[in-house]
Curated annotation (Swiss-Prot):
Residues 1-18 form the signal peptide. InterPro entries: ApoA_E, Apolipoprotein_A1/A4/E. GO terms for molecular function: cholesterol transfer activity; heparin binding; phosphatidylcholine-sterol O-acyltransferase activator activity; phospholipid binding. It comes from Thryonomys swinderianus (Greater cane rat). Residues 74-245 are annotated as: 8 X 22 AA approximate tandem repeats. Residues 204-273 are annotated as: Lipid-binding and lipoprotein association. APOE is an apolipoprotein, a protein associating with lipid particles, that mainly functions in lipoprotein-mediated lipid transport between organs via the plasma and interstitial fluids. APOE is a core component of plasma lipoproteins and is involved in their production, conversion and clearance. Apolipoproteins are amphipathic molecules that interact both with lipids of the lipoprotein particle core and the aqueous environment of the plasma. The modification Phosphoserine is found at residue 141. APOE exists as multiple glycosylated and sialylated glycoforms within cells and in plasma. The extent of glycosylation and sialylation are tissue and context specific. Glycated in plasma VLDL. GO terms for cellular component: chylomicron; extracellular exosome; high-density lipoprotein particle; low-density lipoprotein particle; multivesicular body, internal vesicle; very-low-density lipoprotein particle. This is Apolipoprotein E.
């Protein structure tokens, strides 16, 4: 009997010791500090919640004026927005994956995403409830309310961490499926291109002789066409040369006619001037003879 009482006392003391030992801090994964944008956003939410859990004087003050809940709302919305953006990015890379596999992965991922959102929503609601309780103080001390809130926040942080890691794993599976599908798509494209190249080579080998013959025929037609055009050009050049000769002959004829007309105009005038000049010279000569004859008679 004494042995049973001793065991009971030891058990009770061990339980009390376990209760007073501080609970280990829940640590966030290292990837939340340098991972995808949604992980970075979740890390900011986690760090802010860890600061709130200290329940310092500043936290108490901001809890009472709803600043904490407002900040958590912004961080929560940023996190869920980044999760949706990353999920959409992965969905665009799931083209070659089977539709049933894609639907199953998408459904599981959507459920994990909803659980994470519900966890963050519960954290915000619990803090809002604490603010209301502190303002009402219905038969409870502030110390009791803070202790109960701290305990509840520890549980919520554990649940948040668990659901966040679950979402992280499912996103990793989703991404692996996208990469595998993309690799299969690239392999299929490579095989298709190889087949097309081989078909092109075979077609070129089969059609090389007819192509050569068609090229020769085309060259002959082109040569004949060039000769025809050259003959037409030479004929046209001869025609232009004849027209130029005709024009030159007409211009020479017109020049001769104009010269004859000018000659007809000026010859009478020149003849009249010559006659007048002869008359003038003759008159001068007569006058000179008359003047030389007069002195001789006086002697």
């Amino acid at each position: 009997m004494k042995v049973l009482w001793a065991l009971l006392v030891v058990t009770i003391l061990a339980g009390c010791r376990a209760e007073v030992q501080p609970e280990l801090e829940v640590q966030a994964p290292a990837g939340w500090q340098s991972g995808q944008p949604w992980e970075l956003a979740l890390g900011r939410f986690w760090d802010y919640l860890r600061w709130v859990q200290t329940l310092s004087d500043q936290v108490q003050e901001e809890l009472l004026n709803s600043q904490v809940t407002q900040e958590l709302t912004v961080l929560m919305e940023d996190t869920m927005k980044e999760v949706k953006a990353y999920k959409s990015e992965l969905e665009q890379e799931l083209g070659p994956m089977a539709e049933d596999t894609k639907a199953r992965l998408s459904k599981e991922l959507q459920a994990a995403q909803a659980r994470l959102g519900a966890d963050m929503e519960e954290v915000r609601n619990r803090l809002a409830q604490y603010r209301g309780e502190m303002q009402a103080m219905l038969g409870q001390s502030a110390e009791e309310l803070r202790a109960r809130l701290a305990s509840h926040l520890r549980k919520l942080r554990k649940r948040l961490l668990r659901d966040a890691e679950d979402l992280q794993k499912r996103l990793a599976v989703y991404r692996a499926g996208a990469q595998e599908g993309a690799e299969r798509g690239v392999s299929a494209i490579r095989e298709r291109l190889g087949s097309l190249v081989e078909q092109s080579r075979l077609r070129a080998a089969l059609t090389s002789q007819p192509l050569h013959e068609r090229a020769q025929a085309w060259g002959e037609r082109l040569r004949g066409r060039l000769e025809e055009v050259g003959g037409q050009a030479r004929d046209r050049l001869d025609e232009v040369r004849e027209q130029m000769q005709e024009v030159r002959a007409k211009m020479e004829e017109q020049a001769e006619a104009f010269q004859a007309r000018l000659k007809g105009w000026f010859e009478p005038l020149v003849e009249d001037m010559r006659r007048q000049w002869s008359d003038l010279v003759e008159k001068v000569q007569v006058a000179v003879r008359a003047s030389t004859a007069a002195p001789s008679e006086n002697h």
